[in-house]
Design a protein with these regions (language model features):
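Short acidic, Pro/Gly- and aromatic-enriched capping/linker segments at domain boundaries
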Residues: 1-17
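Short, surface-exposed, charged amphipathic helix/loop patches that serve as local interaction elements
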Residues: 20-185
C-alpha cells in the first residue's frame, strides 16, 4: 500500500539551495492554499495564455508580418502542431516566433507568458515559506498567510528562485502519488 500524498502545511521540508549556507522551511500547500496561490498568480499576472491562444496569436502575427508568404509559413505552424517533438519544425517555429515578436498581437501574449512564468517562484515562495535560518537573514515573518514582499525581497535572487521552484514542485504530486487513490464510484 502506498502512502497518500502530503499536502499539509504541517509537513514542513527543510531545503538548502545549492551553495547556500542558509536553510529554508517550505510547506507543501493544502488544497485551499493552492487555490489561493493560483488566484494570486492570476491577480498579479493575468491568466496564463493557453497554447491555443499562443498559436492563434502567432498565426495572426505571421499574417500581419508576411501577408504575401503567410500561407506557406502557416503550413509550418500546422506541421509543428501535428508533430511538436520534431526538432526541425521546432527550429523553424523558433525563427517564426522571433519575427512574430515584432508584431504586438504576439508580443503581448509572449509578455504575459513570460511574466507569469517569471512570477511563479516569487508567489510560490510567498505562499509556501514557513521559516528560514542562516547568516544575513532577517527574522522570518508571515502576514495574512504570506511572507511580506519587502521581507522576501531581501533574499539573494538565486536562493529565492531555488526556494520558489522547490515550493512550486511541492504543489505537484509526483507520479507515484498521482495515482495512489481509488477513483470515486
Amino acid at each position: 500500500m502506498s502512502a497518500a500524498p502530503v499536502f499539509s502545511r504541517r509537513a514542513v521540508e527543510s531545503f538548502v539551495p545549492e551553495g547556500s549556507p542558509r536553510t529554508y522551511q517550505i510547506a507543501p500547500l493544502t488544497y485551499l492554499e493552492r487555490q489561493n496561490y493560483r488566484a494570486d498568480m492570476t491577480r498579479r499576472c493575468g491568466p496564463l495564455p493557453s497554447q491555443a491562444a499562443m498559436m492563434s496569436a502567432l498565426r495572426a502575427a505571421i499574417r500581419e508580418a508576411s501577408p504575401g508568404n503567410a500561407a506557406t509559413l502557416l503550413v509550418t505552424v500546422d506541421d509543428f502542431e501535428a508533430e511538436p517533438e520534431n526538432d526541425d519544425l521546432k527550429a523553424h517555429l523558433a525563427a517564426l516566433e522571433a519575427v512574430a515578436m515584432g508584431v504586438p498581437v504576439y508580443a503581448e501574449q509572449r509578455a504575459l507568458q513570460e511574466r507569469h512564468l517569471g512570477m511563479i517562484p516569487w508567489v510560490a515562495a510567498q505562499h509556501a515559506l514557513r521559516g528560514w535560518e542562516g547568516e544575513r537573514l532577517p527574522p522570518f515573518a508571515r502576514e495574512r498567510g504570506l511572507v511580506p514582499e519587502d521581507l522576501l525581497g531581501v533574499l539573494p535572487e538565486g536562493e529565492l528562485l531555488a526556494v520558489g521552484w522547490k515550493a512550486f514542485s511541492l504543489m505537484q504530486p509526483d507520479q507515484a502519488a498521482a495515482g495512489n487513490s481509488e477513483p470515486p464510484s
